[in-house]
Structure formats: C-alpha cells, structure tokens
UniProtKB/Swiss-Prot annotation:
This is Ubiquitin receptor RAD23b. GO terms for molecular function: damaged DNA binding; polyubiquitin modification-dependent protein binding; proteasome binding. Residues 242-285 form the STI1 domain. The gene is RAD23B. Belongs to the RAD23 family. Coiled coil: none annotated. It comes from the Eukaryota. Residues 146-189, 325-365 form the UBA domain. The keyword Nucleus applies. Residues 128-142 have a biased composition (Polar residues). Residues 1-79 form the Ubiquitin-like domain.
C-alpha cells in the first residue's frame, strides 16, 4: 500500500509498504527513498496519532492505514526502539522571533578572522556542534505570527487530540518556536532549563586571537557587530532599569527595528548576539518582554525615506564583520548564485561560515526571501 509521510517543515512524500512491515523496516524504507543524509534510520522518530511508534511493532498493530499518515522527525541522538520516546534535543537554538522565551545559551568563541566586509550585523551561531547540527539550527522552521498559529494547529493534529493548544504553545515557547524541538518536548517533557534565563558570561565572548579590525567609517560602535554597547545600559542607570524606554533614542535599536520590520527572521540571531556582547541588556529585555515587543513593533519614523535596509546594506549598515580571504571568496560564490549580498552574509554567518550549508539554506528558503 502507499503510505504518506509528513515532515515538520510542511512537506510530504509517499512510500510503498506492507501492513505487516515493522516500524524499523519503514524507517529503513524512508532512509532508502529519501537518502541516508536526510533521514538516517537510527535517528528517525515515526509518529502516528500523537504516539511515537516502537521499532519492533508493525504498521497493522499501530492501526496505520493507507488513508492515514505518519509524521517523521529526527532526534539528535539515536532513538531507542523499545523506549518509544523522543530524545530531547540539546543543541542550542537562537532567540525566537517572538522573543517570548528567556533562554540564552553560551556560545563558543569564533575563529581568527581577517579582512572586514561591510554588512548587516547578522551574528554567527557560534556553537561547538557538528556542521549538520549547525545547519539544522539555521534551516529549522522558526515561525511567528500567522505561521506560528498554523504550526500550533499542525502539531495539535499530529498529537491526535493528546495535546491542547496551551500545551503546544508552551512547548513551542520553550523550544524557541522550533516545531521539531517542541514535538520532542511534548513527548519527553519540557526541561526546566528551557524556561530559565541563563546569562552568557562576558568571558565567553572574547575571540581567540582575532586581529582587531576597525569598523567602517560612520559606525556608532567601536566593535564590529556590537549593536548595543555596554554604555547603552549604563546610560539608563540614572533612570528606571525596569523599563526599556531609553531604547527609543538609541541609534542601534532603531537600526534593529528597521531591519526587523523588513525581515522579522533576523530578530533571533540579533538577540543571540546581544546575549554574547551585552548580557546585562539582554537580561533587561527578558524581564520586560512585552515592552520590548511593543517597541520593536512600533512604526518607525521616516520609514518611507529610509527604505529597506537590506536594499542598500553598505550604505545603511556601516558595520563590519571579519572574514578570511577564503570566506570572502565563499561569500562571492554565494552571491553569484543570484542572492542578495545581505541575505548571503546572513545565511553564511547563521550556518557558522559553512559555504555548503549556507547554499542549502538559501535555496531552501528562497521563497521566504522573495516574500
């Protein structure tokens, strides 16, 4: 019989199976048809009516029919067939677009860089994880707004009535709006650490032997990518530290607002970078999330005259990032594929400066960029 298999990214494919096939055999079938690199058998979790299927059971035992469907997702570590539970993914994910959670995880220092490249300040997700994990973080479906509501409904349907809307929303919040991780949490429980703020020590933000490079002229900061200098919080010291009103007149914050209005997806890497450079300000934002979202969503003055900051990145964003000559060539090759330079740099940094992963990310999300 033909069996439909859905993914958490909204796509689906069909495989041919027998009702007597075991779940392990179905996983092997998916691996063979979709590729070992995409769906390795040992990392697959198959879900039917809100239940993770055990490897030794059969399709007929789990009442899987041709009219129904399975949901496939990947666990970071190999899933135990007899356990029947999803393993909680522990890889770090950047701050959510909705900014509704308050977890910031430490990031490893970047490698030595050299020549500057003017660009929009999209930080790298500098994680001590494998490249495949890095791409998973960069390309994972981080959703917001109407897309978030749609994802909530999809996950509720996936659970077959096992989860209510409040539970799914809480799981998504704890998972930084990453649906794959949220489903993991729904099956295995939401770790308490996922809902606790973890300030990033300043000692962890220093680069390892990186040569200092001055930012492009006109930049309001002396450090590349430093959107909110420590003085930003210090300047508010005489006022009420429980409010973010002082950000209204902050040039860096106005730049962030302009960019977020034109491309909401960049907010979460911005917040991650902020956590590395200025944990005190990030903590303040976490304590006043509603006010922060209100400030970000307010219409900015002169928007008609300023235009989209992604249209003229070199003029609008006088910051600099540090790249090696080899990385500069990689960026140019990605640009040659027809993508905007600012988007190329955003993807390149988000994929931990891996050209192949950045290319895949740009291709997979090209429709979103056009919107």
């Amino acid at each position: 019989m033909k069996l439909t298999v859905k993914t958490l990214k909204g796509s689906h494919f069909e495989i041919r199976v027998l009702p007597s096939d075991t779940i392990m055999a179905v996983k092997k079938n998916i691996e063979d048809s979709q590729g070992k690199d995409n769906y390795p058998c040992g990392q697959q979790l198959l879900i039917h009516n809100g239940k993770v299927l055990k490897d030794e059971t059969s399709l007929v035992e789990n009442k899987v029919t041709e009219e129904g469907f399975l949901v496939v997702m990947l666990s970071k570590s190999k899933s135990g067939g007899s356990a029947g539970q999803a393993s909680v993914q522990t890889s770090s994910v950047s701050q959510p677009v909705s900014a509704t959670t308050s977890s910031t995880k430490p990031a490893a220092p970047s490698t030595t860089q050299s020549s500057p490249v003017p660009a929009s300040p999209i930080p790298a997700q500098e994680q001590p994880a494998a490249q495949t994990d890095t791409y998973g973080q960069a390309a994972s479906t981080l959703v917001s707004g109407s897309s978030l509501e749609q994802m909530v409904q999809q996950i509720m349907e996936m659970g077959g009535g096992s989860w209510d809307k409040e539970t799914v929303t809480r799981a998504l919040r704890a998972a930084y709006n990453n649906p794959e991780r949220a489903v993991d949490y729904l099956y295995s429980g939401i770790p308490q650490t996922a809902e606790v703020a973890v300030p990033v020590p300043e000692a962890q933000i220093a680069g390892s032997g990186a040569a200092p490079v001055a930012p492009a002229s006109g930049g309001p900061n002396s450090s590349p990518l430093d959107l909110f200098p420590q003085e930003t919080v210090a300047a508010a010291g005489s006022g009420d530290l429980g409010t973010l009103e002082f950000l209204r007149n902050n040039d860096q914050f106005q730049q962030l607002r302009t960019m977020v209005h034109s491309n909401p997806q960049i907010l979460q890497p911005m917040l991650q970078e902020l956590g590395k450079q200025n944990p005190q300000l990030l903590r303040l934002i976490q304590e006043n999330q509603a006010e922060f979202l209100q400030l970000v969503n307010e219409p900015y003055e002169g928007s008609d005259g300023e235009g989209d900051m992604f249209d003229q990145p070199e003029q609008e964003m006088p910051h600099a990032i540090n790249v090696t000559p080899a990385e500069q060539e990689a960026i140019q090759r990605l640009e040659a594929m027809g993508f905007d330079r600012a988007l190329v740099i955003e993807a390149f940094l988000a994929c931990d400066r891996n050209e192949e992963l950045a290319a895949n990310y740009l291709l997979e999300n090209s429709g979103d960029f056009e919107d």
